[in-house]
Each structure stands twice: as structure tokens, then as C-alpha cells.
């Protein structure tokens, strides 16, 4: 059950923590999610079937650095981030409750890697012909997500079977052959963000972006029922960036 997992345990620890390690707004968000899991929220519930499916997929994915399953190697905070994002549903509809997943965290905490796990799960489970994008200040940074996805796929025999691989990795995109879902990295400095239809998108290092890339991605999702935007960043020494707007 979800209550027995690392996501719920981490949320409970964050709420109870008294040494100043957890910011107050994180505590409030964790308490809000605990209320959902405990069936105390009038608008949202957790989907146990979706949770079980995600756990099985993570058991198939191999961590490229730890050489164990993603299920075993994932950090506790990442379990909460991924589980809350993908398994929290609207009570009156089979749609994700959260349409934005926001993560501000210090460097070297695997935020792009954890986003890659979410993207692989989505590419395997979303409806056929779904499209996914990452946006960042330049193509090199935007392609960090592609690199992380590629490393996980290449390390996971179940995903890269020589006879019938689940994914096709191209220079400019990654395609899930099971359903023709595709992921493409975009660069704010080179690519127009308009005219895309993003079932899900990642804004990486949002502290170095203005609001145009995120708003363009969101505009592309207007007609979609089950949409998701993941916005991640460390802190940047400027007052004009989309991360500050999202936190506010």
C-alpha cells in the first residue's frame, strides 16, 4: 500500500521534523498530501493502482550509477515528488490532481534525473502519440534530461531489449515504440516554443528563464485533459525569473 511506502514516510517525517531542515511551505505541502492519502481531502484521492504500476515500472528501470533498480535506489524525497505528482487524482475524475510539479532544491540533488524517471513512466503509460518536451536556456542544458533518460534506458535490459526495444533513441528525440510517444528537448535560445502540443513538459533551471517558455508550454496544453508541467531549479541571484513567479 502507498501508506507503507517511502513517499508517505518522508512526508510524515517532513511534517514532524523540528530542527529547521524542512521549510514551512514544504511542511504545509506534505501535510496537505498526507490528508489526501488519509482520505481527508474533499477534492483529491490517491490512486493505488497507479502507484502499483509505477512501482513495477521502477523495478524494471536500472539506476545507471548505483546499478540497482530505481525502486531501490531512489531518494526518499524523490519518492514523494514522483508519487504525489503521478498518483494523486481528482476525486470526481480520472485525471491528475496536480498539473504543476515544482521543485526548488540545491545543486547535485538529482532533480533532472528524478524528472527523467517521471518522463520514462509517462512515455510508457500516457495515451498513444503523446508528446513531451523539455525547455531550458540553451540546448545543452535542455538535453540534460535527454541524457538522463538515455542513461536509464541504456542501463535497463527490460527497456532496451536487443530484439524488440521499447525505446528508439535518436539524435534529436527519444521515441517509445510501444505507443509512438515522443520526447524532444527544446532550447529557448534557438527554438520557438509556440505550436507545440505538450502532454507534459519540463522547465529545467527555471531560475535562469523568464516566463515565456513556461507560458508557451502551458498554452499548448489548453485542450488537454491530463496535462503536467514540471518546473525545477536551484536558486538564482536575480528577481526576474519564472521560478520566483511560480513559488509566489
How should each PLM-predicted stretch be described?
Residues 1-248:
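Phosphate/NTP-binding elements of NTP-utilizing enzymes
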Amino acid at each position: 500500500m502507498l501508506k507503507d511506502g517511502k513517499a508517505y514516510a518522508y512526508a510524515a517525517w517532513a511534517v514532524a521534523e523540528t530542527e529547521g531542515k524542512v521549510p514551512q511551505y514544504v511542511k504545509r505541502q506534505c501535510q496537505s498530501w498526507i490528508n489526501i492519502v488519509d482520505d481527508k481531502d474533499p477534492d483529491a484521492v490517491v490512486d493505488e493502482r497507479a502507484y502499483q504500476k509505477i512501482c513495477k515500472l521502477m523495478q524494471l528501470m536500472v539506476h545507471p550509477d548505483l546499478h540497482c533498480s530505481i525502486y531501490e535506489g531512489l531518494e526518499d524525497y524523490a519518492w514523494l515528488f514522483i508519487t504525489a505528482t503521478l498518483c494523486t487524482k481528482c476525486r470526481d475524475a480520472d485525471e491528475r490532481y496536480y498539473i504543476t510539479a515544482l521543485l526548488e532544491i540545491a545543486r547535485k540533488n538529482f532533480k533532472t534525473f528524478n524528472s527523467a524517471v517521471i518522463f520514462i513512466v509517462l512515455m510508457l503509460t500516457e495515451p498513444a502519440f503523446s508528446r513531451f518536451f523539455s525547455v531550458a536556456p540553451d540546448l545543452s542544458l535542455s538535453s540534460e534530461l535527454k541524457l538522463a533518460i538515455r542513461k536509464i534506458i541504456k542501463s535497463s535490459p527490460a527497456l532496451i531489449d536487443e530484439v524488440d526495444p521499447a525505446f528508439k533513441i535518436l539524435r534529436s528525440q527519444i521515441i517509445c515504440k510501444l505507443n509512438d510517444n515522443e520526447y524532444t528537448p527544446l532550447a529557448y535560445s534557438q527554438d520557438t516554443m509556440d505550436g507545440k502540443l505538450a502532454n507534459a513538459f519540463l522547465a529545467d533551471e527555471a531560475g535562469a528563464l523568464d516566463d515565456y517558455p513556461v507560458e508557451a508550454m502551458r498554452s499548448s496544453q489548453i485542450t488537454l485533459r491530463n496535462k503536467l508541467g514540471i518546473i525545477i531549479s536551484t536558486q538564482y541571484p536575480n528577481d526576474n525569473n519564472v521560478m520566483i513567479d511560480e513559488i509566489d
